[in-house]
């Protein structure tokens, strides 16, 4: 397996994704298939599920002759990837030779840019890292396709600001959706905050006929998922009283990062 990322914006997305996932689990299992990189990860509380698909066309180069499933320490991998932000190219390599259990992470630079920087005394050097793989048992969950009652698209930066503000008033978010408005509520022992979002202010909005949603989620987990707002300028949110909430970032090139969060269940 060998892949390359050359675009600076995509390097930031790729690095940012694993910076986020290191807070979910102590390890990450990556499935390299012939036409994609696939990751499924449950957070430590088992409340959130990440489902990530990055197609081969998203990368500058992607080559995988057979399916490879490898697991790595999430924190160490995120630390190594973070160094890639200083470089022009990230290369990941893995060879299934049985006795070699390593992933190779190479940070390379555009020669023309490097030569120009060297003239200014600012040359950057290529870096070559190795990280040991770990042996764990991993089961992939089947995620059924469902029809949600409410779907809307909103600016990812804006919804992060809203969730963060609500989180200062309480740990839980109550969402009410109707044909004309989305109402977000959070409260503590002595204070309460309500934020109304008119549907006209959304990029897209769809709700099933005569449907009204009233459901609650953990704001702590929602804020954690929305830390990945750099992945895309917009986020799609899907709701139903019968299914987990879906938050989906479109990365382009038929690639996406999806987060599922189970609703809060309160005792009567």
Model-inferred region functions:
Residues 1-22, 27-168, 174-268:
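DNA polymerase sliding clamps and clamp-related checkpoint/processivity subunits
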């Amino acid at each position: 397996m060998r892949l390359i990322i050359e675009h600076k914006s995509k390097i930031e997305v790729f690095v940012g994704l694993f910076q986020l996932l290191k807070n979910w689990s102590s390890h990450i299992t990556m499935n390299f298939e012939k036409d994609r990189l696939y990751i499924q990860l449950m957070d430590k509380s088992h409340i959130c599920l990440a489902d990530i698909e990055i197609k081969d066309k998203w990368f500058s180069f992607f080559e995988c002759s057979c399916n490879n499933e490898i697991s790595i320490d999430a924190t160490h991998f995120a630390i190594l990837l973070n160094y890639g932000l200083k470089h022009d190219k990230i290369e990941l390599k893995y060879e299934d030779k049985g006795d070699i259990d390593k992933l190779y992470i190479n940070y390379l630079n555009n020669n023309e840019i490097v030569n120009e920087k060297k003239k200014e005394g600012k040359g950057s050097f290529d870096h070559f890292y190795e990280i040991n793989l770990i042996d764990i048992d991993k089961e992939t969950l089947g995620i059924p396709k469902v029809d949600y009652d409410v779907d809307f698209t909103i600016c990812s930066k804006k919804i992060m600001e809203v969730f963060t503000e609500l989180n200062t008033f309480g740990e839980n978010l109550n969402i009410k959706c109707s044909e004309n408005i989305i109402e977000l509520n959070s409260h503590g022992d002595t204070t309460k905050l309500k934020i109304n979002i008119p549907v006209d202010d959304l990029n897209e909005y769809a709700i099933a006929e005569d449907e009204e949603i009233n459901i609650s989620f953990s704001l702590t987990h929602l804020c954690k998922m929305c830390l990945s707002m750099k992945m895309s300028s917009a986020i799609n949110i899907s709701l139903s009283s019968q299914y987990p909430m879906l938050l989906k970032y479109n990365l382009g090139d038929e690639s996406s990062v999806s987060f599922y969060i189970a609703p809060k269940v309160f005792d009567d």
